[in-house]
Amino acid sequence: EDVKYQWQDKAYKATKAFSKESEKLGFFGINMASTGCGKTIANARIMYALSDERDGCRFSVALGLRTLTMQTGDAYRALLKLGDDELAVLIGSNAVKLLHQLDKDEKKNTASANGSESIQDDYEHLFVSYEGQIYDGRLKRWLSSSPKLEQLVSAPVLVSTIDHLMPATESQRGGKQIAPMLRLLTSDLVLDEPDDFGLEDLPALCRIVNWAGMLGSRVLLSSATLPPGL
């Protein structure tokens, strides 16, 4: 076993020790480690340690950049062996996915160079890599007209840009805040690389962390260079 990653085992054991207490008292953690030390996988292990094995593990990873979202999804598929019925990767459009594929094949940062992080899309234009579904019931019937929102809510592990969860803290026309709110209500939250955001984004980040905590989510911040201001 690589010595560089042994800290993950320590983090898992330390978190597991108070997983029961976190169900009632909540959890707010910070995972700080240098780039290349395995924070992405450690985040998943920490959230798994907090979860109840009988109920299963459900968590959302929110990032600031779409290219990092795709890379995180790839890491979870490859290293955690998560299938398409367990992991949902939510990005802006098929175009971003194709750019990411070019990046993997050609080892170039094509998606970032084209500024795909700034694309604004509605849920109708999202590409969701996920094949699971909600069991029959009222929620499934309510979401039947929007399959992509159903995927957003139902996936055990969700990796997405944070803008897809942010409507949970805002009043949206047509009830568009309901699906992100349901996601936070039924899963824990990982904010990955929050330092990618500017200071002007801090109020929005604080709102989603506060709202997630009020809904019962356990929250983890993960970063290699988290500034004191955050």
Regions found by a protein language model. Give the residues of each.
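N-terminal helicase ATP-binding lobe
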Residues: 1-230
